[in-house]
């Protein structure tokens, strides 16, 4: 028996082709275990998931866990469920443009620490709340352009986005933008605000002054930003306004003005006293005349 085992040939080293196939199968199994099944109607390749232009009414479930670039553009998506991005911590690019979104759930980006590019253009957002980008500290680019119903941006909407470089708010319905919304963005390089119905009243002056100091490196579409009101500046380029344009917002009174106001107040007071005095005399005379008439009748 021992001689028989001694005479059996030992297998040689594995063939390179077989080794390669084994490695590929193992990698495939690992890839499958990581959750890389591609959703229906989507294409998945090199950590890019493309579900664009598929007439989707809702976001696809169960994306590959290692997704870095997700495109859901050109669909009919009306909502993103809370926690949708919880498992996709490698996500860097999220494209949701040209859908029917009106809002995003609170805390959507809580686990998307690597998210850098977010496209929300061509949707139906009416406002940007304070917690819309909560915990999305890695954002570099935000596109909110072409949201025609966008009327309000909360002063703290972009709070904590220290890495933000590009912000597009063009072609919306903004008439006013708080300076506070932009002051906390030290890295901002490109700001697009053209195509909005800006009301260039006194409340616009702080923002305009801030933008004018940064216009060379911050505002990309300064020629497209125009005033829709008040009537005296309607149609004027926003950045053509000067300090003289807001002169009425800073009226200062001279000593002569104060003296004139005091004089007018004094005259009004005297006139009021005199009027009350005359009314009192008239009432007293009427009372006496009425009493005298009653005595004559008796």
Curated annotation (Swiss-Prot):
Record GO terms (molecular function) = potassium channel activator activity; transmembrane transporter binding; voltage-gated potassium channel activity
According to the record, the signal peptide region is 1-34
Grouped into one coarse class, the protein's main location is membrane
User: Where in this chain does the record put each LRRNT domain?
Assistant: 35-65
Which GO terms of type biological process are on file?
A: positive regulation of voltage-gated potassium channel activity; potassium ion transmembrane transport
Q: List keywords of the entry alphabetically.
A: Cell membrane, Disulfide bond, Ion channel, Ion transport, Leucine-rich repeat, Membrane, Repeat, Signal, Transmembrane, Transmembrane helix, Transport
Keyword Disulfide bond (UniProt) = yes
What is a single cellular component term in the Gene Ontology annotation?
A: plasma membrane
Q: Spell out the residue ranges that the record assigns to LRR repeats.
A: 66-87, 90-111, 114-135, 138-160, 163-186
Q: How does it sit in the membrane?
A: Single-pass membrane protein
Q: Transmembrane region positions?
A: 259-279
Q: Where in the cell is it found?
A: Cell membrane
Q: Which residues form the LRRCT domain?
A: 196-251
Q: What is known of its domains?
A: The transmembrane domain is necessary for interaction with KCNMA1.
What is the stated purpose of this protein? Auxiliary protein of the large-conductance, voltage and calcium-activated potassium channel (BK alpha). Modulates gating properties by producing a marked shift in the BK channel's voltage dependence of activation in the hyperpolarizing direction, and in the absence of calcium.
**What quaternary structure, including any partners, is listed in this protein's UniProt entry?**
Interacts with KCNMA1.
What's the name of the protein?
Leucine-rich repeat-containing protein 55
What does the record give as the organism's lineage?
Answer: Eukaryota, Metazoa, Chordata, Craniata, Vertebrata
């Amino acid at each position: 028996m021992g001689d028989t085992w001694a005479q059996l040939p030992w297998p040689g080293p594995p063939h390179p082709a077989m080794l390669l196939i084994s490695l590929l199968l193992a990698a495939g199994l690992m890839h499958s275990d990581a959750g890389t099944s591609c959703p229906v109607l989507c294409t998945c390749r090199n950590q890019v998931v493309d579900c664009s232009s598929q007439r989707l009414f809702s976001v696809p479930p169960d994306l590959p866990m290692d997704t870095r670039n997700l495109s859901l553009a050109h669909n009919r998506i009306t909502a993103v469920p809370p926690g949708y991005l919880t498992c996709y911590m490698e996500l860097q690019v999220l494209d949701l443009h040209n859908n029917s979104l009106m809002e995003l759930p609170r805390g959507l980006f809580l686990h998307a620490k690597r998210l850098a590019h977010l496209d929300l253009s061509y949707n139906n957002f009416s406002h940007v709340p304070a917690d819309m980008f909560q915990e999305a500290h890695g954002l570099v680019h935000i596109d909110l352009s072409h949201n025609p119903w966008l009327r309000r941006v909360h002063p703290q909407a972009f709070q904590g986005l220290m890495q933000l470089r590009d912000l597009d708010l063009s072609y919306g319905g903004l008439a006013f933008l708080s300076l506070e919304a932009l002051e906390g963005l030290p890295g901002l390089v490109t700001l697009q605000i053209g195509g909005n119905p800006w009301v260039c009243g006194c409340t616009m002056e702080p923002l305009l002054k801030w933008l004018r100091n940064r216009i060379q490196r911050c505002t990309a579409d300064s020629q497209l930003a125009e005033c829709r009101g008040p009537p005296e500046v309607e149609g004027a380029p926003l950045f053509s306004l000067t300090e003289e344009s807001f002169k009425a917002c800073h009226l200062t009174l001279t000593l002569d003005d104060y003296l004139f106001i005091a004089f007018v107040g004094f005259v009004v007071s005297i006139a009021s006293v005199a009027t009350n005095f005359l009314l009192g005399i008239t009432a007293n005379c009427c009372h006496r005349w009425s009493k005298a008439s009653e005595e004559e009748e008796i």
